[in-house]
Swiss-Prot record:
It comes from Hyphomonas neptunium (strain ATCC 15444). The gene is mraZ. Keywords: Cytoplasm, DNA-binding, Repeat, Transcription, Transcription regulation. Residues 5-51, 80-123 form the SpoVT-AbrB domain. GO terms for molecular function: DNA-binding transcription factor activity; transcription cis-regulatory region binding. Its main location: cytoplasm. Forms oligomers. One of its GO terms (cellular component) is nucleoid. One of its GO terms (biological process) is negative regulation of DNA-templated transcription initiation. This is Transcriptional regulator MraZ. It comes from the Bacteria.
Length: 165
């Protein structure tokens, strides 16, 4: 799982070091997929083969001619760059993705559980402020608490415990 936030940098050749915990979350794979996040945040999103397989299975659930399926295929699958992780944990980000994310010099990596994001630090700060205003809203806390309780009840019913056990 991709968790936490890390600082990084892009060198003159467009290479970035993927944080060691993120490389571990990739399961030792030497490949990573990166695309422009489709939510308009300006971030790049990345993940491994497991995430792409999950997307493939999810897309197979949608009708072949579905506009939603086509949009996801176009904006994520077709727009993904498949990158090789070198022996030092670096990848070379394509220039078009660096431009789309306004990435140069310092960058931020943020874990998104199943995926991770690569951010321009200023964009990341703005995003954090927006997300903090959303997460503190009573309706957000209520929705999360309800979902949490449903998951916890399912886990307990399955004999897996309630609090992260």
């Amino acid at each position: 799982m991709f968790v936490s936030t890390y600082e990084g940098a892009i060198d003159a050749k467009g290479r970035v070091s993927i944080p060691a915990p993120f490389r571990a979350a990739l399961g030792g794979s030497s490949r990573v997929f990166v695309w422009q996040a489709p939510d308009g945040s300006g971030a790049l999103e990345g993940g491994g083969e497991e995430l792409m397989e999950l997307y493939r299975e999810t897309l197979a659930e949608l009708p072949l001619q579905s506009p939603i399926r086509e949009a996801i295929v176009t904006c994520i699958i077709a727009a993904s760059a498949e990158l090789k992780i070198d022996d030092t944990g670096r990848v070379k980000l394509p220039e078009d993705l660096c431009e789309a994310g306004e990435l140069s010099g310092k960058i931020k990596f943020s874990g998104q559980m199943d995926s991770f994001r690569i951010w321009n630090p200023e964009r990341f700060s703005l995003h954090q402020m927006r997300m903090r205003s959303i997460v503190t809203a009573p309706e957000t806390l209520d929705a999360f608490a309800s979902a949490y309780n449903r998951v916890r009840q399912r886990r307990m019913a399955a004999g897996r415990g309630g609090e992260g056990s």
